[in-house]
Regions:
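N-terminal, polar/charged subdomain of small-to-medium soluble alpha/beta proteins
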Residues: 1-88, 100, 104-148
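Short hinge/gating elements
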Residues: 88-96
């Protein structure tokens, strides 16, 4: 499972011209599910999202987690995180999980994170317009199976 985590002042998702989800200060996380991912990957990603210390404390140091800062989470599925462009010019998505299983694990991750923080979501397998105001900017790449 792969995530692009962005600290933000606000973020929102629009589907078919209608705002479907919006958060204030917190994180926008783009989440890709890989073939072979399991609930263990969901647990790992959720734990990192909730507890990663990328929010400033009273001294201006990145010392607080999403949970500690009272921030919100916008979790958006994005299979293109597994796009492979090493060969040719058009990305291949052979590593991305099939839609039914990917949606199941995406929803499981949403459910897990919702136990700790307010979570907004995009609509799975739709064309979305995602906007945010980066804070920092702070952007972290996270993979449940490897380091970048």
């Amino acid at each position: 499972m792969r995530a692009v985590i962005q600290r933000c002042n606000w973020a929102r998702v629009v589907n078919d011209g209608v705002e479907t989800s919006k958060i204030s200060k917190g994180m926008l996380v783009l989440l890709g599910v890989k073939k072979g991912d399991t609930e263990k990957d969901c647990e790992y990603i959720c734990n990192k999202i909730i507890n990663m210390r990328i929010f400033e404390d009273e001294n201006g140091k990145m010392n607080k987690s999403l949970l500690e800062s009272g921030g919100e989470l916008l979790l958006v599925s994005q299979f293109t995180l597994y796009g492979d462009v090493r060969h040719g010019r058009r990305p291949g998505f052979i590593e991305a999980e099939l839609p039914d299983r990917a949606n199941e694990l995406y929803e499981k991750t949403v459910e897990m994170c919702s136990k700790y923080v307010k979570v907004g979501t995009g609509k799975f397998q739709t064309d979305m317009k995602v906007s945010l105001e980066n804070d920092g900017p702070v952007t972290i790449l996270l993979d449940s199976q490897k380091m970048f």
